[in-house]
Amino acid sequence: MSIAENVAEIRRQMEVAALAAGRDPKGILLCAATKMNDADAVRQAIAAGVDCCGENRVQELTAKLAQNAYDGAPVHFIGHLQTNKVRQVVGKVSLIQSVDSERLLAAIDREAARQGIVQDILLEVNIGEEASKSGFAAEDILPLMEKIGEFSNICIKGLMAIPPISHISGENQKFFQKMFHLSVDIRQKKYDNVEVDCLSMGMSGDFADAIASGSTMVRVGTAIFGARDYARDSSK
């Protein structure tokens, strides 16, 4: 199947999942995870109607920006971001989804202040409490919100999570539901620089379960572009 056909099929599945959950399909965004896909593939996905593109690596982001690969859609950064590469991302993307530490939060705020902008971000939550993954612990999110007013050049737009890898349908629903309840808890309070209207969770293998649990953005790569060939990955 072509990229356009894959996008159409994912949209169909998203609609089915949304309607089954009593939700409006238009309230859920499709973010194309473009890691290891070239500028032409990205352009095809945008032409097929994805809502935004998500890039995992600073090197790829920089190269594709130079090629105008993202024209026609917002670009987000969705991979682990090192503090020494913040300058290459802040102001270049509409949303940084993967803010996983207070140190990174502060670095983004400083760079945004230097540029005279407000950078939109999501806080990444290590919802499965996995030692191999970065992210804030769920119990640290609400206390962190009390300090967000100190960072005047960032705006928290919501939360992002990558649950543990599972090959069993529905197994990650408990993590998705925990994320949803955490986002509700934040919305019920009033914090400076916080507008929690985005809940980014769900990928190629589990986006239907994420939608059933309240996701407002799914990040899909393999189901759009096909399996990645890591043997040919020269950027590792």
Where are these regions (language model features)?
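Conserved alpha/beta-domain cores
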Residues: 1-205, 213, 225
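Expand to "…catalyze enediolate/carbanion chemistry for C-C bond making/breaking, isomerization
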Residues: 208-212, 220, 224-231
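Mg2+-dependent phosphoryl-transfer enzymes with acidic/Ser/Thr/Gly-rich catalytic loops
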Residues: 233-236
